[in-house]
Each structure stands twice: as C-alpha cells, then as structure tokens.
Amino acid sequence: MKTTVVYLVILCLIVSCTNGETKHVRKINSDGSEAWGYVEVRPKAHMFWWHYKSPYRVENPSKPWPIILWLQGGPGASGVGIGNFQEVGPLDTFLKPRNSTWLKKADLLFVDSPVGAGYSFVEGNQKDLYVKSDEEAAQDLTKLLQQLFNKNQTLNQSPLFIVAESYGGKIAVKLGLSVIDAVQSGKLKLHLGGVILGDSWISPEDFVFSWGPLLKHVSRLDDNGLDSSNSLAEKIKTQIKNGEYVGATQTWMDLENLISSKSNFVDFYNFLLDTGMDPVSLTTSLKIKKEEKIKKYSRYLNDMRSLSDVEDVEGDLDKLMNGVIKKKLKIIPNDLIWGNNSDDVFTAMEAAFMKPVIEDVDELLATGVDVTIYNGQLDVICSTSGTEAWVHKLRWEGLEEFKKMEREPLFCESDRATRGFTKSYKNLHFYWILGAGHFVPVDEPCVALKMVGEITKSPQL
C-alpha cells in the first residue's frame, strides 16, 4: 500500500448550518481516498466518522464493491481509534502499513459510537445527552447513515456490512433492524449486505455462566472458584429475570473481580494470559473500576506489540489520537481529549449492559439478512461456549438444520494448518477461529481477512 504516512493535505471543507449552528462537517484528503467528519445526530450530539476508500476497489456495476461499518465495544470504546489503528485499518499505531488491513476486501467506515466515545461528543458535556439504550444508539447511527449514504450514489450502491466487536454486537443487531425499517420506509438509501457479530455480548447471562466451567477446564479455577463463580452467575440470572439490570451490571463486576482473584488474574480477553501482562496491571487491586475496563480493552492490544525498540511516545494509542491524528483531522474541538468520556458512556448505558438481544437476532434472521457470528477460541468474556449457548436459544426456523450441518476447516493461504472451522445454513453463518482471543483480527489476521472476504464476497487479489 502506498500510504505510509498520515495524509495532511485537505482539499475541501463542507459546512452546512442551521440557525447559525454547524450541523455537519466533512473533510476529504488530497487523493479522495479518505473522508471524515461529524454528523449532528441529535441537537448538540455530534458523532464522528472516518471513511477509507479501498485502493483495491474493483469497479463493477454488476457487483458493487462492499463497505464495512465497524462498531467497537465497551460501550464507550472508540472504533476510529481501536478498530482502525489497532485492528483492521490501513495503518497501525506506528503509522506503518498493515498487511492484513480489511481494505483489501472492502471500504472501511469507522464510527465513534455511542456519542461520547472517541472523538464523538455532546456540547457542554451535558451527560443527559448520552444514549441510555442500544435502541437509542442504533437510532443515532441510522441518522448518521442517512446523512452519509442518501446523497452519495457510490456509497448507497455498495452493500453495507455492519461488523461489530464485543458490546458493539448488541448495537449492531439493533442497527440492522433499524436500517431495514428505514430502507423500507424510504428514509435511507442503502443495501444491507449483512450483520457480522465478532465475539459479541449478545446474551450476558449465557456468558457469565460459561466463565466458571471454561476456566475450570483450562485449570485457571479450581472447584472452589467454580462454585463461587456459578453462585454469582445464578444471582445475575435472577436479577436479569426480575429486570434488575443495573444490579446485574454491578454483580457482573463483582464476578469479574472474584474470578480475577481466584485465577490469579486471568486475562478476560485471552485465557492463556494474565492481566498482569497488560500495561494496565490489575494485580494491585481487586476492585476493577468501569473506566479501567474500558482502558484495558485498548491497552491489551498495545501490549500485543513490543515497544522496546521505540521511544515511549510511539505506538501509544492515546498519544497518537490526541496528537498527530487530531492535528491531521483539523476538525476535532481543541478541548476534546480522545477517549476521555468513555466511562460516562458506559455509566449512561449501565441499565442496558446486561440486557440480552437474542430475540432481536431472531428477528434479523427472519428478515432474510445474512447474520455471521465469529468467535475466538481463547476468549473468556465473550466465550465460544457462551456464544454457542445463546445461538441454541434462537427460535429461527432454520436452527435445527444449522445444528446438523458439518463444519468445514479453515486454512490460511498455502499453510495447511487448521486455523478454524465454519458452517452455514441459509442466512446464518458461524466461524470458530482457533488460536484467537477476543480480538480475532489481531490474533489471527490472515484467517480473519480470509473470513471477511468470504462474507463480503470480495474479488480475490
């Protein structure tokens, strides 16, 4: 890829105003390969987006090039930062080309959602403007898509694939349904290619019940730890059943703290690691604050790269996003600190955090839209066994046939080592990715790229 440095030349600035207030801001780089901006999705609520046009794009009117909308987890983590620079974007946090960028298979649209994540913001730090539910987050994203797609023929002719990681999966399911409704009512012009759920927090109850047995099986918990874990999981189940969702979120934190203590701080994103291996070490305290959970989500990825041969200022995502990237973009408010409000976003959605969306996945499948699930073998927080448990609760008419299907092995290029398995029936697809934790594109970039190509049906390079 030609891009080895961040583009600095800006060709155009388009600002549309109402009553003297800036509503939408858009910028494009010198060769048109990147565009970014803000959309005011609600009064005083501004959502940031960044679109990369793929240099591998094949112009074929009969088969339009796909575009991927990437949604991060948290809620409160930044897709523009984490998903882009640490996972699938064209450059890594050292601003070096990423060989496994998903631009090889599709255009990429990163969004900081919900508002308050990353570069997105509310005016005057009015916390009551943060969304409180997955439905509200999906509504904001639908408004953003209307602004970006309705008047852009290139975009609205491309199939849009909503790809989500972790908590982003809950919002992605709601967004898929919202997009279908908006398209059918004539409010949105786009073609929904599918919804892809990567290690997604679809059914919190099923996941918390999976943690104890999984960690006992891999020797990170003993019988005492298993019993304690299952006891708190039962409490969470009761709280969810009674609609006590805030209480369930608090008990979820208690359960993570308990498991951390009993397992000598197993990493919830990869059970082969300790959290003490991360830059954010939790070994000094058994009490994990919400903001530390959000920071840990990103800093886990920082730790996957060796920083020993570079200066401390290089490779750090916080410094990158608040430094050279903020300077490049030119439209970020001067007083905005990237990622500074992630905890406020999480707190606002505390009552939504433990709500399941299995019924919404059922509804999505019933529309005929392709739903793809992928899961890393080594993940704990959104474990494969937990994912399989909620999938088996689906009421979709094709579930029994799906369960009967044989899996096919996955390989990476000429390497014949088994990298995973997949199976499909009608519009439900599942990928089991071996050797990967919570962040599949980071741990197994080659097979992840192959998977994305299969999902989007992109031309072979």
Swiss-Prot record:
Glycan-carrying positions: N99, N152, N340
EC number of this enzyme: 3.4.16.-
Cellular localisation: Secreted
GO biological process entries: proteolysis
Expressing tissues: Expressed in seedlings, roots, flowers and siliques.
Keyword Glycoprotein: yes
Domain of life: Eukaryota
Residues at the catalytic site: S166, D379, H438
UniProt signal peptide: 1-20
Family named by the database record: Belongs to the peptidase S10 family.
Protein name per Swiss-Prot or TrEMBL: Serine carboxypeptidase-like 51
